[in-house]
Swiss-Prot record:
It catalyses: D-sorbitol(out) + N(pros)-phospho-L-histidyl-[protein] = D-sorbitol 6-phosphate(in) + L-histidyl-[protein]. Keywords: Cell membrane, Kinase, Membrane, Phosphoprotein, Phosphotransferase system, Sugar transport, Transferase, Transmembrane, Transmembrane helix, Transport. The chain crosses the membrane at residues 194-214, 228-248, 250-270, 278-298, 312-332. One of its GO terms (molecular function) is kinase activity. It holds the Pfam family EIIBC-GUT_N. Induction: Activated by sorbitol and repressed by glucose. One of its GO terms (cellular component) is plasma membrane. This is PTS system glucitol/sorbitol-specific EIIB component. It comes from the Bacteria. The EIIB domain is phosphorylated by phospho-EIIA on a cysteinyl or histidyl residue, depending on the transported sugar. Then, it transfers the phosphoryl group to the sugar substrate concomitantly with the sugar uptake processed by the EIIC domain.
Amino acid sequence: MEKYNAIKIVKGSGGFGGPLTVKPEEGKDTLLYITGGGAEPEIVEKIVNLTGCKAVNGFKTSVPEEQIFLVIIDCGGTLRCGIYPQKRIPTINVMPVGKSGPLAKFITEDIYVSAVGLNQISLADSSAEPIKSTKVPEEGKREFKYSADKKVSQSLAENSKSSIVQKIGMGAGKVVNTLYQAGRDAVQSMITTILPFMAFVAMLIGIIQGSGFGNWFAKILVPLAGNGIGLMILGFICSIPLLSALLGPGAVIAQIVGTLIGVEIGKGTIPPSLALPALFAINTQCACDFIPVGLGLAEAEPETVEVGVPSVLYSRFMIGVPRVAVAWVASIGLYQ
């Protein structure tokens, strides 16, 4: 009887990507989950039972990439969505998010699947071929003077002594290509990230104003957001280590509360000068869910991750109230 079994993962309602067929193997049998607050998603236990792999909480320790056969995230569409697909590690997102974030180009259907729940995971057929991230061995290549993937000017510049004219031409070409690619990336980021966010905020403001929720919430919010002391209390709540990692994913909480505060400032309920300390108060928890991923990108040792995650969480807790107080002092006299 085989030690490990292959599973098939399909996208859920509103999801993207897949289906993925994955199977652990000796030395590459770790299921890494990096979800808000280090909470274990319900699908982890099912995957472990079906495959025979071992699960590791990315908030508590790190795992060498060569030992990871599958990653589970709960990203709402930011950088974390594309980090592991970029490394060609099969990725499950429990949120219904598609090609989104600055690494969207790496999020493809053959390595990523989203909106995954218990019903989307099952044992794979014996004939199914699991994903294998193997490097293609390099074969000896015959040398040619010209190449189909390079311009004549590039080939001449590489294969012969470049003249001043060639150097100037190549330099100008690189500058133009760099600017052109920067423009393409900027437009792509606008389409995939900024415009959807603007639409989300517009919809949220419409719901708040149309439903009357804003008036009800304003009565609760004004005692906190309407003065500096209240904002420091709000910053204290958002910086509590047990809550900050849960409030961080996708910055959804900060977006909603920020929109509500912005609407109330526009209506005159909250003084405009409190916009600055309010910004610091509602963003104290930002990126607290990203700490293990960031340490992993820096190739931190497991011991470093174990110490680094609580260190950052507690450092945010210690500076949560002081940063709001400094912003409150700096906002005195604004818009007057």
